[in-house]
Amino acid sequence: MEQTWDSYISSLNQNSLPRQVEVTQGRYSGSLENLSFSKGDIITVVDLEPVFVRAELKDGDQVLDVVTIPLRYEGNFQLMADPVSFETVADLTRSVRLPQSPVAPRSPPRFQNSIPISADNLPMKLRKGETLSLIGFQESRGRRLLQCKVLRKKPPLTVLLPMDCRGHFLECQDDRFYSIDTIVRWKMLAGRKRTVRVQARHHPKLLGPLVPEHFRGHLVLYPCFSVTANLLGETRVSIPSDLDISVTEIARLDRKPRTTMRQIYSMEESKFPVRVKIMNVVQSESKEYPKPLKRGQLLTILKTEEVKKFVASEISQGKKGKCFLVPYTYQGLVLRRGRYFYAVSDVAAAMKHGELCFQASQDYTSYLGSFASFRANECFLALKKSVVSAEIHGELHRVEVLKCLNIATKAHVKLPLFAVGKFLELFDGARPGTLQELCQVTRLPCHVRVTSPDPSMTVDPLYGTKELRIENVIIEQCLIAKDEPTLEDIISSADMYREWPETTFEIPIEKISCEVLVVEERSWIADVRKERCRPLQSIQEVTKESLAFSNCLVIRRPPPPVPKPRSLF
């Protein structure tokens, strides 16, 4: 079916890439963009990168304004549930972007089935109205299945739904708020319009000069993408999504279709090891992936593996610097340090699991008699969060406070959540240990200092940092690979096997968009003990953006505002 380029790109999400299309109506854009397409040209779409978002501001059915929202826009938005159901699981996965990792992010998409569901591989029939949390994909006996959690079951039941399963799935209302960057990358519905509301405390005038002061309507988002694509002759280009051409999708180009690392990961375990040739590759120019792949390179994919990693941020004077992915098996010794809290609201958020001691590093003066002031170096024991009534500017307001014990004076005080003190957590001394050992006795996030480097690494980038914040533990889906051996290696196969632990490396399938050609399924080495294939220890420096939109990085919320006189509103 012929479509405009813009319409076709809007129908895609990362789950379905790469895709190949044929140009049915060409376009010449001159020497500035250097993009010229003729009828019959073949384009392989390998990646979509959002650039900005156009949005219609609507009050009911009336369009008030059309604005452009940059990806770094600071305001947050709430999703409005899509009112139209998806008939089958295949329809659902074509529209909803899902993580390829089996570990669910903090806010996985949730849907309800409008009709009962029964399938051969389900342990029980799912009744109408079950809430399903969509986790990711799983391959079984050559079939791609959708992995879900049935939330009303205790404990939650994990089920695998085939693509042809009918459920008339309706999106559930999500009460969370997200940045525009997170929405465009993870929360859009391919082929459908995404409608959002502005966060109540956000000033709507920041969206545009024509937005009413008390705007309570909604926005319809139209993201614009930069499309990474391959042209004939392995030329790689970036194509804007609003290019004026028409295309039609094609199934495959030759008898030996190319596949992706993601599809290789989904193969049955019995088909490994497999030999592949890299046909083209897209990978970040940052330090996120330490071993670059090259076009024409031959690899032996030994197995798939779910690799646990710590997400760590370097801390300097209370501010975050570099971010790292640290192997779960990291053997450097660390010493726990107190966490940094900007405001009292951060202390309250951190004490969910018990009482907490903290020290102020700057003075705070309260102009309200019911709330306490404090000076730098004063120490407190946080007891519990509460709400009190206080007279502010002659008016009675309900204010959230943290009830604390002043450790020096033994006085019980109330600190408002909006008070800023740049606090440091206090706790009893602890012995050095590994990150794994630390996670067994404390909850993440926590702050540490590396006291001894990992002995297996030539250079440990964490050793020498003043302070690290261990944010989270993630699981990356990886292919364990080695460079294809030479003829001499194959002849002396025993030597090759002996070298595997030193030469294998990880290929994280979420970080590399790569087309490969399967050269040979190497069943003749299937009897080799795969447990010997261990990738080398490596610490990867990653960008904050790559962690933020994938829900791996814990982002501090600003403290609540100081109550203002109602006469100002």
Curated annotation (Swiss-Prot):
Pfam families: CABIT (PF12736)
Region called CABIT 2, residue ranges: 255-523
InterPro entries: CABIT_dom, THEMIS
Tissue: Specifically expressed in the intestine.
Region described as CABIT 1: 1-254
Similarity field: Belongs to the themis family.
Record protein name field: Protein THEMIS3
Species whose genome carries this gene: Mus musculus
Gene (UniProt): Themis3
